[in-house]
């Protein structure tokens, strides 16, 4: 996808893998303390800092822990959020993201999923190929789970029932 030039964003990553020539994109990476240095910035530290800036896009290259809570907070407060997380399908990736949020917070799984329903699309990739895309269309109070609409699965696109 393309981020419009009038939008700003932060890209938070462990190593400098993601890049762009976008004029208003801020890049931050993890710093490990080495030797006598006491300076250390984790993905979580950088995510917390990202919430203090005026951004349209909030991007974390790969979520693996407590930074998930701040990513969820950014999504819940209207940022456009992009990240990667390991899962076996597009729908299971959201459950894994909820797990990571749970590590950092005392929110219930249901509360986490209610907040995560602001994430609009989930893309599942395998062997560098898109296998599945799901749209998050809401949260079900009956099943206490996210409600998805399949968009794409292994070469097949699904029609949106909301379109004529």
Q: What function would you assign to each model-found segment?
A:
Residues 2-115:
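Switch/coupling sub-region of P-loop NTPases
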